[in-house]
Each structure stands twice: as structure tokens, then as C-alpha cells.
């Protein structure tokens, strides 16, 4: 194994005093962790960057690590002694092996986010493999069939929150179509010294536990002055009836989170060097558990060239929002011999992550003030004058029977909350749908999925000229949403919001990226129109902190079944007041944003409040695949399904 910045058997831990091990009193505990003496101390403010490992064969060790990001001692879950873990660099066309050894006292796992691979290598305990028991080693064997910016993380309980995350860069086998002089990974995450089990318990008992910006009497009179007393009272009563607050932007906030950039708190000021005139590629990865970040580099425009590992037509912006688990690659080109701040503020404006681009180490730039804290509106609850579709007008269809023998897909998933009390809905495959057999079907026997769109990729199936790929179909599953214990509200109106940058970003005077801007650089590889539609409502009860699809938590829901080779449209309707980043394992999600053959391929899609989003899926890889909200505590509160491709 070739290891950049790190010799074999040594860990890379250039840490600052903000991240030191717990002094001489902790010496026994440190020795017990058996890091081979590889511990470092540095001066306050010294930055650290994860190691980079490149090649075909990798050895990763998962263990506990004493850390101090905040001035308080805590314990992280580290990979090779680092939080985040080492940057892994793979190459398209190679077959890589990753031997993961678990030195924790509990089971662990690594999921390779958005990597197309055999289902038994996906790393989801209880679904695709048993997990990695304490003291054991599991070897992942992955044929690499794509390129781009990705990441990896644990799929075991809350280990992602405690630091088991890292960047994964897959280099294109051919010459990269993106022109740049140097590159940096910018890995964002949200750190807390609080035990995640405690956070989850707090949210279950009081969903706004971490909301320190509740409405006050002055807020009410300010709203009344803006829109009149009667509308202000009406809105106030509406929020009260729903047991919600317009200030509840993020479930977990800077009240407990410290926002890190490449493992550095803001004071540590991670710095990337450049020479004026260079084209710098910044690979942004949101590896946080619960935080949407709004990214800008004051003084520089950013040209977005890749989204979720797939090339897009360049679009120049001042700012973009990155949801949990999303990745964006941008090009910046500073011309002056000066420093620039990389500024990442969470949606609720409760803190920030910060780094610097500079010609020399030690240079800094001004940190901009945070934007005003946004507030939800009745529009976010589907109660504004939006001219959207009423819930009663949504198409429905008859119920299909689920295929028996799928108990594995409903078992408890790595400690997930599996309580339930609502009726069952089942999404099943139509055995008469158009499929492709024998063409690129990926499984563990050696066949591969459809290729990723690229400069040398030809569509496997030509685009249909006679069918409208975005025409509405009758959903193959019945959806009748009613207010109840697991569904606190149902929007009167929903709409497409692809041109909306998101709450807190409209009208801020900056050019902000939207999903409507994303146009794939290369034509999609599967031109067939979908033959059926699966409609899913994102539902929840904020007060009880229950989340799910179609009013159901994971334990009460049958798997969504797809026939191998079929092409399906997923329609997501957000009935809640929060954004949800929805991630389907194992398969690409082709976002229907109006670009037809050039709709962008994504792996994680943000669905805004009261929004309807649709995307196409080619079921080209068999297996049991996780499908869930990537807000970690939402997933564990029930917003999880299994998709079975067979």
C-alpha cells in the first residue's frame, strides 16, 4: 500500500493543543489503545489535515481516540488515529481491498457512500452484512466503476457523529476533464462533546431542546408590524396548533456543536496554499450528522463543476448550500497575493466552520459576519399562496401485495428506533414492467452496473423520442396521508422548488446555486422512460420526534421492491417543515430538473419543506439497499426503508 504523508504502520496525527490527549493522568488509557506511540502535541492553533492513502490495498483500524476540539476532553471514534479519517484515493478501473480492523468494544462498520458496488460490500449492518465485531477484521473488495468526490462513514448507531467519517476521492482512469492546478479536500462535520445517545434522548423528550432562538414577544410585535396584527395572530395560532416553531431550523445546533473543517475548529484556521492565478479545485464534502452548510469564499467566485461525484456544466456562483452527505467540486482562481476565507455557516446561523486560502502560511482574511437567522413561514408548511397542487388532487392507485420472505429487510438496523403504531403500506414491483436483462447488471458474481456518464460513455439505451420521460404516471402504491400520531400535519399545497436556493438564501444579494442550475456534462446512459412511479411522503411528528415515510417508521414498513433492470420514477413529497437529504444506496438518482437527457446524477437529494421532487432510478444492481434520510437522528427515529432489487 502506498501511503502519502504516512509510513506503513504509523498514524498521522499532527494535532494542536485543542486536540491533545488527556495528559499524564490518561497515560494508561492511551497505552491501552495501542497506537504504537504515535501521539503528537502541538501549539494552540496549529492546523491538522488527515493523512492521504492511495493505492489498491488499504488497512484501516477503528478505535477510540481522546480529543479536545472545544476546550473539553472527549472521546472520538477514529480511523487510523484521525478524525476525520484518512483521505482515501482510489482509481477508476481498479479493484481495491480495504481491510478494516475493529478495536472498539462494540461492533462497527464502514459504508462507502454512493460507491457502486456489490450489495454485500455496502457496509450496512443487518442489511448487507453482519457488521464488524470487536477484535475482528472485515475485508471489503470493491471493483471501482466510477470517479469523483465521495466519502465514507460508519453505519453503526451514532459512530458517524463521534468521528467515524472520511473523504474518498476516485480518480478518473482517463485524463480528468476538469482543468485545475492544485486541489484540496474541504471536509465539513459537526462535532459534539455530548454523547449522541443523550442528544437523541433529549430530542425524543423535547424536539426543540437545542433551539435557543424561540419566538419572543418583541418578535411577535415585529411580525405584526410587517404583515398586520390579524395575519400575525393567525400565523401564531397555526404554528401552535401544529406544535411547531418557525425558529426551529435545525434539530441540533451550535448550542452543542462545534463546526469543523478538515478536523479543525475555527480558531485552528486550516490553510490551503496557492500561487496567484492558479485554478484551485476545492472538493467540498458535507460529512456532518445534522447540519446543512452555506458555503462562500468572500472575494472569489466559485465555478461548480461537479455534484455528487458527477460532472456538471460549469456554473459560477457566490454561494451554495450543501446538504448532509452531498459533495460539490468547485474551481476558484485567486489573482491577488492575499488571503481568502472559506466560510461555512450552518442554516440556523448558530456558528461556523472556517478555513483559509493563502499564498503563505500564517496569513488570514476577515471572517464575514453570519447572515440573519432564517425563519420558517407558512409557505414552508404548504399553507401559503403558492398555486401548487393540493394534497387531495394527488394521484393514487390500488395496493399491491408484497413478496414474502423479506424479513431480513425489516429487522432492527444497528440499534435503530423501531417502534411503530400505524397501518402498513407496501411498495412492490410490477412483474410486467419493461426491464433489461443480461446488460450490465451488477452483482457479486462479477457483472457490473451501468457505467457512470463520462466523456467516453455511450448511452446503453438510446433516449426515447416517442415517450416523454418526465410525463406523469399513476403511482403503483397507495398513499393516503392523514394526521395522526406519526403525521402531525399534511400540507394543503406542495410545489416544485428547484429554483429556490433554500430558506435564508433568497434575496441575500449573492448568486446562489439551485438544483435547477445543475445540468449534467454528459448524457445519461439509460434513455428509457420510467414504467411506473413510487410516491413517498416524508412525514413526521416533531413534538414526539418520530420520522418516517408515508407515516410509517422503519419497523412497520414493507420493503420497496424493484425488479432487476426496470426503470422507475421516485416521487418524494415533503409533508414536514424541515429539509431532508434523502439517500438511496447502490443506485444513482437522476434528478428531474428539466434538463432531459442531461438531468444530473445524484446520490443524495435535498427535499425542501412542502416540496415535490422526482428522480429516475435504473435498478441495475441486485441486493438489499438502504434508503433513508441522512439526518442521522431522523434515520434512527424511523425515516428509513429498504429497497430490494431482485
Feature roles, as predicted:
Residues 274-279, 321-326, 492-494, 501-507, ...:
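Conserved "landmark" site that anchors the functional core of diverse proteins
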Residues 2-15, 22-324, 330-331, 361-448, ...:
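Histidine-centered copper-binding motifs that mark active-site loops
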Residues 44-54, 58, 461, 466-469, ...:
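N-terminal pre-domain segments of enzymes
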Amino acid at each position: 500500500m502506498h501511503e502519502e504523508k504516512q509510513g506503513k504502520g504509523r498514524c498521522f496525527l499532527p494535532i494542536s493543543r485543542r486536540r491533545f490527549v488527556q495528559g499524564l493522568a490518561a497515560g494508561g488509557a492511551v497505552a491501552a489503545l495501542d497506537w504504537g506511540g504515535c501521539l503528537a502535541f502541538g501549539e494552540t492553533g496549529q492546523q491538522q489535515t488527515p493523512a492521504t492513502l492511495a493505492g489498491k490495498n488499504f488497512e484501516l483500524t477503528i478505535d477510540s481516540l481522546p480529543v479536545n476540539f472545544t476546550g473539553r476532553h472527549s472521546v472520538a471514534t477514529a480511523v487510523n488515529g484521525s478524525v476525520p479519517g484518512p483521505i482515501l484515493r482510489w482509481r477508476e478501473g481498479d479493484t481495491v481491498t480495504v481491510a478494516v480492523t475493529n478495536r472498539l468494544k462494540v461492533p462497527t462498520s464502514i459504508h462507502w457512500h454512493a460507491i457502486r458496488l456489490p450489495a454485500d460490500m455496502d457496509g450496512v449492518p443487518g442489511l448487507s452484512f453482519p457488521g464488524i465485531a470487536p477484535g475482528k477484521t472485515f475485508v471489503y473488495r470493491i471493483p471501482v466503476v466510477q470517479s469523483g468526490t465521495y466519502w465514507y462513514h460508519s453505519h453503526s448507531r451514532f459512530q458517524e457523529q463521534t468521528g467515524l467519517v472520511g473523504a474518498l476521492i476516485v480518480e478518473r482512469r482517463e485524463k480528468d476533464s476538469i482543468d485545475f492546478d492544485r486541489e484540496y479536500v474541504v471536509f465539513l462535520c459537526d462535532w459534539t462533546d455530548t454523547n449522541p445517545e443523550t442528544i437523541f434522548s433529549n430530542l425524543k423528550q423535547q424536539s426543540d431542546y437545542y433551539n435557543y432562538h424561540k419566538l419572543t414577544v418583541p418578535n411577535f410585535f415585529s411580525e405584526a408590524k410587517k404583515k398586520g396584527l390579524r395575519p400575525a395572530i393567525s400565523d401564531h395560532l397555526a404554528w401552535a396548533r401544529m406544535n411547531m416553531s418557525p425558529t426551529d431550523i435545525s434539530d441540533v445546533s451550535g448550542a452543542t456543536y462545534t463546526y469543523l473543517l478538515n478536523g479543525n475548529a475555527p480558531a485552528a484556521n486550516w490553510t490551503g496554499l496557492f500561487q496567484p492565478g492558479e485554478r484551485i479545485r476545492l472538493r467540498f464534502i458535507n460529512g456532518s450528522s445534522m447540519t446543512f452548510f452555506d458555503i462562500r469564499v468572500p472575494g472569489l467566485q466559485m465555478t461548480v463543476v461537479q455534484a455528487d461525484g458527477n460532472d456538471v456544466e460549469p456554473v459560477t456562483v457566490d454561494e451554495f448550500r450543501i446538504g448532509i452527505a452531498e459533495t460539490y467540486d468547485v474551481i476558484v482562481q485567486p489573482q491577488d497575493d492575499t488571503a481568502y476565507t472559506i466560510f461555512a455557516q450552518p442554516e440556523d446561523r448558530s456558528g461556523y466552520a472556517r478555513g483559509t486560502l493563502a499564498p503563505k502560511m500564517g496569513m488570514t482574511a476577515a471572517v464575514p459576519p453570519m447572515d440573519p437567522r432564517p425563519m420558517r413561514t407558512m409557505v414552508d408548511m404548504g399553507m401559503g399562496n403558492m398555486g401548487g397542487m393540493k394534497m387531495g388532487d394527488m394521484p393514487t392507485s390500488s395496493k399491491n401485495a408484497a413478496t414474502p420472505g423479506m424479513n431480513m429487510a425489516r429487522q432492527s438496523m444497528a440499534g435503530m428506533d423501531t417502534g411503530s403504531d400505524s397501518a402498513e403500506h407496501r411498495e412492490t414491483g410490477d412483474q410486467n414492467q419493461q426491464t433489461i436483462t443480461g446488460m450490465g447488471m451488477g452483482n457479486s458474481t462479477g457483472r457490473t452496473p451501468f457505467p457512470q456518464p463520462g466523456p467516453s460513455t455511450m448511452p446503453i439505451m438510446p433516449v426515447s423520442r416517442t415517450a416523454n420521460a418526465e410525463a406523469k404516471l399513476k403511482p403503483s402504491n397507495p398513499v393516503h396521508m392523514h394526521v395522526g400520531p406519526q403525521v402531525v400535519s399534511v400540507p394543503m399545497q406542495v410545489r416544485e422548488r428547484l429554483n429556490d436556493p433554500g430558506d435564508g438564501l433568497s434575496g441575500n444579494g449573492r448568486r446562489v446555486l439551485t438544483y435547477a442550475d445543475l445540468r449534467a456534462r454528459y448524457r445519461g446512459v439509460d434513455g428509457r422512460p420510467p414504467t411506473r412511479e413510487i410516491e413517498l411522503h416524508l412525514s413526521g411528528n416533531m413534538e414526539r420526534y418520530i420520522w418516517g415515510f408515508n407515516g410509517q417508521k422503519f419497523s412497520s414498513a414493507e420493503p420497496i421492491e424493484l425488479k432487476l433492470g426496470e426503470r422507475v420514477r421516485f416521487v418524494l413529497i415533503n409533508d414536514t417543515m424541515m429539509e431532508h437529504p434523502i439517500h438511496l444506496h447502490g443506485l444513482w438518482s437522476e434528478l428531474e430538473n428539466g434538463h432531459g437527457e442531461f438531468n444530473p446524477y445524484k446520490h443524495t437529494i435535498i427535499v425542501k419543506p412542502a416540496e415535490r421532487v422526482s428522480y429516475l432510478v435504473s435498478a441495475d444492481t441486485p441486493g438489499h439497499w438502504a434508503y433513508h434520510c441522512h439526518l442521522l437522528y431522523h434515520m434512527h427515529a424511523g425515516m428509513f426503508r429498504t429497497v430490494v432489487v431482485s
